[in-house]
Each structure stands twice: as C-alpha cells, then as structure tokens.
C-alpha cells in the first residue's frame, strides 16, 4: 500500500481520505471482531477531528454506514456473508465510486493513521499499526525494511539526526518524496515546536564543532555525551593527555617541528585500516615513489613558509635517493634499456608519473610544483651526488650527507646499501653502456627496504601507529632500558620515531621518580620539590608555581567569574570548576574504581575512595602519630591538640 500522509508543509486542504486507513479484502478477512471494532472507532474519530477544526466537508456515506453498524463490511468487498449475515442485503450508493461493486474504502491506500489530535488518537493509531508488525504478509505492498527502520523511535532526536545525515536520494521514488522525507527527519531531529531558534542553532553548531575536532579527541568528547558547545569547550580545554601536535588542525604544523614529517588527520583516517606487515614476511609488490612520500594538499601547501617548502623539497630528494640507494625501480615512460645492456632485469615496478589527480591529498600536483622539474631533476640530482662521491674516492660513504649521521646513530644499517652494486652501475655509466636514466632501472632486491631498531619485531607503515608506539615505548624505556626493533616502511616516519631513543621526550624526576613526556610539565613539577614560587600576587603576596594559577587566584581579588553555567546561571572563576559543575547536570561520572566499579565526578574523590581499598593513610599527625585518609580529618584532629594546649596554659581558678 502507498502512503499519502499530509505533511506540515502542505498547503492543500485535508480531506477524509488523507486520514483514513484502508484494508484489502484479504487483510479484512484476517481481522477478528475486536480489531474490526477498533477500526470503526478510529475511522469515526478521524472524521470528528476533521469536523472539529472546521473543515467544510460533507459526511461520507462510509461514516454514516459505520455509525449505523458495529461491524459493517458488505459482501461486495469480498468478505464471506457468514461473517456479517445481518447486513448481507445492504447496497451501496453507486455515486460513491465509479465502480458500483466496490466501496470508496477500497481506493484508499494508507499505511498509517494520521489524526489532527495526536494526543488522543496516538495510542489507537499505534494499535492499528501493530497489526502490520504482527504479520508482515498482510499486504503485498508492505513497506520495505528501511521504511520500517525509519519508523522506529520516531521521537528520538538522535535517531532522527542519524537518519537525516545518512539519507540517500536513491532510496526515494522521486524528488518530492525525498524532500518530504528530509523535512520530516529534520523536524523530528530539531523539534522546532519544542525548541527556540537559539537552541536549534546551538545543535547545528555543536554537530559541526564536533566534526572539526581531531579524530582521537572527538571520539573521547562524544563518549562524555556533551549537550551543548559550552560543555565541549570545557572538556577540550581540560584535556591534558593529548599532545599539542594532535590537537592542532590538519595542515598547521606545530612550531619547531619538521613539516615533512607531519601527516594530516585526513591521511591518518584513510590509513587507519591498513595492515601491519611483519618483518619476517616482506611485501613482494614493487614499491613506487608515491608509496614512501609525504603528501600535502594544495590548502596545506599554502600554509607552509618558504623555509618549510625548501625543507620539504630536500626531504623528498633524500627519500628518492634512499630508493635508488637500495635498488628500487623507478621508471620513466618511453624509456627502455639499451639493447646491449647485459644486466639481468627483474619484474618492472609501476611507472612513476607526475600528473594531476582528483584526490584531495595528492602528491603528484604538489611534487610537480615543489621539485621544479619533476622526476627528471630528482634523478639527475641523485646521479650527480653518486658521481661526486666516486670522484672523492669515498667508497664507504653513503651518497647523501645524512646517511652517515644516521648510520652513526644506529638508525640505519650499513648493509642497507649495496656499494658493490652501485660501483658496477657507475662503471657501466662511465663506459657508455648505460645512460643516466637507465641507471635508475637497475634493481637491488628490496630485502633491505625496512629500517629497524633493536628489540621488538613489528612493522609500522603509518604515522598514527608510530605515535601509538611512542607512548607505549616511553613508559617502558625507563624500566627496561632495551632498544627497540620497530620497523618502518617510510624513512621519514623512521626519523620521527628516532626521537624516542634520544630520550628528549622522557623526563624522570630524580626526587620522586615520576616520568613526564613534556619537558614543560617536568620543569613545573621540579618547582614543587625546590619550593620555588616565581609568580607572586601583588595584592596579598601569595606565590604560585604556574602563571595560570596566579591568574586564577587574582580573580578572587577582582571578583571576576568568567565561566557561567548555561543550565543554572551559576558562575565560576576556573575552567576545571565549571567542568566539574557541569557533571552535576549531565550526571557524568568519568572516574571509575577498578576494584568495586563505583564512579565519581572528580578524580580527587576517586583517589580518596581508593584508600578504603588499599588502607593507605597518608596524613599523619606529627604529635601523636595518628594517620588519616583525608587532610581535612587531620586538620580537625590537630585542633584537639591545640585546645588541650590552651587549657593547660590557662591558670586554675
């Protein structure tokens, strides 16, 4: 059956056929007396609703017949006479339908019952719709599974939002149906009858803001179920476990970092599902220059300065040199080996082409602008360095300056480059047996393509996996002291990983043994042991370790409370305070005890609760030695000593 439901945007007058439910003779025969009685009540109620809103319509004969009979359904509609024998002789007015043998109800094909008074008719309409849910074979034109899914939870705004975002035009029969469906889903999501314009705008901005966050941060924020933008801002500002580089938008390199080593969030999403290749099973597929290069879109390229672009060009040349040094094939179209070349050739690799691409993140378009000459210049540059190295008679030196430094630091294996193979190729170049382009076609078996460290046997292909490994390695490095046999398929990614082994990102406190990833956090922590408080309040002379703490303290004197709760209007002078307060409205308890499962809104409450499991009492009285789990309990206990001391000093009367 086809649905003809009037929508809130329709300007056409509503008639009785638009709000009625029709049954075929087969469907009517499956209904019992109770269901038929329910049908009669709903039909009469729909008619009364139309009359109540002053719709000028004449009473249909169907309504008159329903008012006169408890279970009216004539024989002409295909129902056996024995079900309603007392009305078997009743005839219909032929003016109601061009087919005298059929009732007007036979031409009404409506799946759902829609009334103007939803509060009254809603429960009864649901009972009518339940008839279809009990038996999906009632009608051969029953709605598809997708339409049934869309009918579930019609009042759930989140479900309506997801269906609105996942809407596909191809699922509709035409543009009018598609537009009506979109309007209905949007109406269910935004609920304009219950929300103001400001609240609707807040919902739209909230969705867009969440989509603009980095993937890792957005996943965590959505798990907290924020209801508005203020809660999202408070959550993001309170995040301390994510690095500054991960928070920066894609295409905006952090200060002091090498732009060529950055991989955008869009690339990480595309590469997230890529497989990790073990070291023992090396890929046999030929590798091209695009497989080991770092890509920038045109928008990202526009954000780079001249120095960063020059650095990018140098690294791309260096990466190409690495390919040549280990014998990877990079071919140019329309270039073939000379007929007199007697060097055995293996299966050729895919050609390296520099051309425009329709992808958002493309290497070829940017590389063409950057290298200013394409692959030909890169090849000539590499060959010049090879010839220069030979003229200086330094057979043990790599063809690039940074190779030596990397070999000394242990990041590159000296066996990765087959110098004998390169010398033989150079001799053929000098003898005229090979031209410069043919040198690049000589292939050394790509068994040396991956760079290793020392202890673990893994392979990493993407920057996101490098970062994950960095964090796990930093936690274990101080305890184990061993190297890492992590393997990478991209030399640029390996350079990023080398920083871990230098120890620049791991800082251990000599006083308490605490480890910090960020040197700035470590410098702040050291002031706790030294007692240094360089930031002093001019009003009261109180000192602080951090400038942010001083700024927060100064609001006590000025009375400034810039953070306001949108729910109750309460104001706060600190971000962390409003973040904790918002949890009282949302009911979020993110800190959960691993022993008993009890959850808390604040981490300090969880720490205090865990002492009931461990029995720890860190606050001890220096006079009697009694220990307490909370500092407030210790302060209250110390007052008993002070009162006793004062009583002893008072003279007896």
Swiss-Prot record:
UniProt domain KRAB: residue ranges: 14-85, 287-360
Subunit organization? Interacts with SETDB1 and TRIM28/KAP1. Interacts with ATRX. Forms a complex with ATRX, SETDB1 and TRIM28.
Which PROSITE patterns does this chain map to? Answer: KRAB (PS50805), SCAN_BOX (PS50804), ZINC_FINGER_C2H2_1 (PS00028), ZINC_FINGER_C2H2_2 (PS50157)
Record's protein name: Neurotrophin receptor-interacting factor homolog
Q: Which InterPro entries match?
A: KRAB, KRAB_dom_sf, SCAN_dom, SCAN_sf, Znf_C2H2_sf, Znf_C2H2_type
Please list the residue ranges that the record marks as compositionally biased, kind Basic and acidic residues. 388-404, 471-483
Q: Which ranges carry the SCAN box domain?
A: 161-243
Family of this protein: Belongs to the krueppel C2H2-type zinc-finger protein family.
A GO cellular component entry from the record: cytoplasm
Function, as annotated, reads: Probable transcription repressor. Specifically binds to the 3'-end of zinc-finger coding genes and recruiting chromatin-modifying proteins such as SETDB1 and TRIM28/KAP1, leading to transcription repression. The SETDB1-TRIM28-ZNF274 complex may play a role in recruiting ATRX to the 3'-exons of zinc-finger coding genes with atypical chromatin signatures to establish or maintain/protect H3K9me3 at these transcriptionally active regions.
Compositionally biased residues, Polar residues: 405-414
Q: Where in the cell is it found?
A: Cytoplasm; Nucleus, Nucleolus
- List the C2H2-type zinc finger ranges: 507-529, 535-557, 563-585, 591-613, 619-641
Disordered, as annotated region: 136-159, 339-359, 388-414, 456-485, 632-653
Q: Which organism is it from?
A: Macaca fascicularis (Crab-eating macaque)
Q: Which UniProt keywords apply?
A: Cytoplasm, DNA-binding, Metal-binding, Nucleus, Repeat, Repressor, Transcription, Transcription regulation, Zinc, Zinc-finger
Q: Which GO BP terms sit in this record? A: chromatin remodeling
Listed as disulfide-bonded, the cysteine pairs are: none
Query: Compositional bias (Basic residues) at which positions?
Result: 459-470, 636-653
Care to name a GO molecular-function term for this sequence?
Answer: chromatin binding
Return any one Pfam family short name: zf-C2H2
Chief localization: cytoplasm
């Amino acid at each position: 059956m086809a649905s003809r439901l009037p929508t809130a945007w329709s300007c056409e007058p509503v008639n009785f056929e638009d709000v009625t439910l029709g049954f075929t003779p087969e469907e009517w025969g499956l209904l019992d007396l109770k269901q038929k009685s329910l049908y009669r009540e709903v039909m009469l109620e729909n008619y009364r609703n139309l009359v109540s809103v002053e719709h000028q319509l004449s009473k249909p004969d169907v309504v008159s017949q329903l008012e006169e009979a408890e279970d009216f359904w004539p024989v002409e509609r295909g129902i056996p006479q024995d079900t309603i024998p007392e009305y078997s002789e009743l005839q219909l007015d032929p003016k109601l339908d061009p087919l005298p043998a059929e009732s007007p109800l036979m031409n009404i094909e409506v799946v759902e019952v829609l009334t103007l008074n939803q509060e009254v008719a809603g429960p009864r309409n649901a009972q009518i719709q339940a008839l279809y849910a009990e038996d999906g074979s009632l009608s051969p034109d029953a709605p598809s599974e997708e339409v049934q899914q869309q009918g579930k939870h019609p009042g759930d705004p989140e479900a309506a939002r997801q269906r609105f975002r996942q809407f596909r035009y191809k699922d509709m029969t035409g543009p009018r149906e598609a537009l009506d469906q979109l309007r209905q889903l949007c109406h269910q999501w935004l609920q304009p009858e219950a929300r103001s314009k400001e609240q609707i705008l807040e919902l739209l901005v909230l969705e867009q803001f969440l989509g603009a966050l980095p993937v890792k941060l957005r996943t965590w924020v959505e798990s907290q179920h924020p209801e508005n933008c203020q809660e999202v801002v408070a959550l993001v500002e309170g995040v301390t476990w994510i690095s500054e580089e991960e928070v920066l938008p894609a295409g905006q390199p952090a200060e002091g970092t090498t732009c060529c080593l950055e991989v955008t969030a869009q690339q990480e999403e595309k590469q997230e599902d890529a497989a990790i290749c073990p070291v023992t099973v090396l890929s046999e597929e030929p590798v091209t220059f695009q497989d080991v290069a770092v890509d920038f879109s045109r928008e990202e390229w526009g954000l780079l300065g001249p120095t960063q672009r020059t650095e990018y060009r140098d690294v791309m040349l260096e990466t190409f040199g690495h390919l040549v040094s280990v014998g990877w094939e990079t071919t140019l179209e329309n270039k073939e080996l000379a007929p007199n070349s007697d060097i055995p050739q293996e299966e050729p690799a895919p050609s390296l082409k520099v051309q425009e691409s329709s992808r958002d993140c493309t290497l070829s378009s940017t590389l063409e602008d950057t290298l200013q000459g394409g692959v030909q210049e890169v090849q000539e540059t590499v060959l010049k360095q090879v010839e220069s190295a030979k003229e200086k008679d330094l057979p043990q030196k790599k063809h690039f300056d940074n190779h030596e430094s990397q070999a000394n630091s242990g990041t590159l294996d000296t066996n990765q480059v087959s110098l004998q193979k390169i010398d033989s190729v150079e001799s053929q170049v000098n003898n005229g047996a090979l031209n410069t382009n043919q040198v690049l076609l000589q292939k050394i078996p790509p068994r040396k393509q991956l760079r290793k460290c020392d202890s673990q046997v893994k392979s990493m292909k993407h920057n996101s996996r490098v970062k994950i490994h960095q964090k796990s390695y930093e936690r274990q490095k101080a305890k184990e002291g061993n190297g890492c046999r992590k393997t990478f398929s991209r030399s640029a990614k390996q350079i990023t990983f080398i920083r871990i082994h230098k120890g620049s990102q791991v800082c251990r406190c000599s006083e308490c043994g605490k480890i910090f990833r960020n040197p700035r956090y470590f410098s702040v922590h050291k002031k706790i042991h030294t007692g240094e408080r360089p930031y002093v309040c001019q009003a009261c002379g109180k000192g602080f370790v951090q400038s942010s703490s001083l700024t927060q303290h100064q609001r006590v004197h000025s009375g400034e409370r810039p953070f306001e709760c949108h729910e109750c209007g309460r104001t706060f002078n600190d971000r962390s305070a409003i973040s904790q307060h918002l949890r009282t409205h949302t009911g979020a308890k993110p800190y959960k005890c691993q022993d008993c499962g009890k959850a808390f809104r604040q981490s300090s409450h969880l720490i205090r609760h865990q002492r009931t499991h461990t029995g720890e009492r860190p606050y001890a009285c220096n006079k009697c030695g009694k220990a307490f789990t909370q500092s407030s309990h210790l302060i209250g206990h110390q007052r008993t000593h002070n009162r006793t001391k004062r009583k002893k000093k008072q003279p007896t009367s």
